[in-house]
Swiss-Prot record:
Species assigned in the record: Thermobifida fusca (strain YX)
Pfam family membership, one: GAD
Chain residue ranges for the region called Aspartate: 193-196
Positions with a binding annotation for L-aspartate: 169, 215, 437, 478
EC number assigned by the record: 6.1.1.23
GO CC term (a single one): cytoplasm
Function text: Aspartyl-tRNA synthetase with relaxed tRNA specificity since it is able to aspartylate not only its cognate tRNA(Asp) but also tRNA(Asn). Reaction proceeds in two steps: L-aspartate is first activated by ATP to form Asp-AMP and then transferred to the acceptor end of tRNA(Asp/Asn).
Protein name, as recorded: Aspartate--tRNA(Asp/Asn) ligase
Amino acid sequence: MIRTHEAGTLRADHAEQNVVLAGWVARRRDHGGVVFLDLRDASGIVQVVVREDELAHDLRSEYCIKVTGTVRIRPEGNENPDIATGEIEVVASHIEVLSESAPLPFPLDGNQEISEEARLRYRYLDMRRPETAEALRVRSRATYIAHEVMNDNGFVYVETPYLTRSTPEGARDFLVPVRLQPGHWYALPQSPQLFKQLLMVGGMERYYQLTRCFRDEDFRADRQPEFTQIDIEMSFVDEEDLFDIGEKLFTRLLREVRGVELPRPFRRMKFAEAMDRFGTDKPDLRFGQELVELTDFFANTPFRVFQAPYVGAVVMPGGASQTRRELDAWQEWARSRGAKGLAYVLVHEDGTLGGPVAKNLSEEERAGLAERVGAKPGDAIFFSAGERTASQELLGAARLEIGKRCGLIDESAWEVLWITDMPMFEKDDEGGWTSVHHPFTAPAQEVADTFHNDPGSATARAFDLVMNGYELASGSIRIHRAEMQQRVFDTIGLSKDEAETKFGFLLEAFQFGPPPHGGLAVGWDRLVMLLAGQSTIRDVIAFPKTASGADPLTGAPTPITAEQRREAGVDAVPEQATS
């Protein structure tokens, strides 16, 4: 073998041992004829002392080398407590260059700011940086733990196809041409949803998979066209069973990766309550500043803007001290989110109200507003008025922005909860109904017989798991009865013929005694991001793509040649069936 020890594993009890190490030159320092090298491998860094100049004469940063030498205790006063090998050093007797390195496009040591484009272009170099390497190791540890949890709870790991048929799941499919059947296409799965339900029909009962999913979505920050999720499905269960396995997984991960003990059972909050209090279905509970509804308070207001179906407010502590430019910036912030603006009132130190909105309020409203919303002298009150959901969402986003700007968020806290009683349907762009989760989600038991009569108020047996403001898992109890499934299809405007064309294989399977079943999927990239203490999922993916879906490393996506296009049958039109 090339080496006898890993560099980062050497300690004082290795003193006087002869060792052979291999790794990269992380740093070189010359001191009066003696050269000090920081030798790095995957295990860490060790200092190598080179007393013969010819051994290190040609060495440069990131040369890959093999070092033969003797471990010794560092001279007193030269210890380095910042590294695990800081008590010792290796005195080199021989150095072999295994491979040389070209000049680096960016430094790998220190805290220099490096553009993300450069990091992704040279991802293999970025991985040599401790922060990137540690994030990937956290992902590996978390993956191992997840497999242990699922195995300990009797789950069977089953791989589902990556080449399947296109089915409507809310986003566009990535399509793959079939060379042997010109004009026909596979689709890469947006999720294994249909296959995992078929596994329940097949009697597997407890299935899980760490799987890749593919969605051809519009460009969005911190989204990837391919991503990983832990997919779980169980037969003969209700919501409590799904909550139980989800909590077992999350508590074990937080305990073993971060040393954090999450109390069980996790908190639960209905969707409607989350929207009313926080303006979002993924509330960050690490700080307060809850929304306050003022619809009744302004029921008789002379201010036309507040004569709306919903009026709400959120308080910004100390916000009255903002400059006019800062307050104007809030308006731009709101407009960037599709709102007309963000009305505000400033609470002066004497308790009087200022700002453009204050003069439009009645004397009674001005007198009682601060107390109603819990504002103190020096605070600012932001308002949103209009349609309920849109107004709440704007205030929810403002609340989060306030938390960040005012330093209200406890970055050391871990707040997790289940959001339950999710809406079953929502309006689409054409004014029809569409499923919020997917069309196989079961309705709440109290509306099981009537949901089709009033889709807008129907709730589903669906839930999300939220941690620190991030949705990390989503699940539901599924429909397993044909009559109920058809009513859902009818509600979303899917005819029997269309349903048969798109989901016929699943509907056929449901004729053979399907069990009651349910499941959930965990967004693995985002969960690992939190576990690793990173701010973007790109930092916990080995070879991520940019927000525009590009891969700076390989140059993907790329055009294909005319020959590839012809051979794949990209332009072929399938023969139409004749009657």
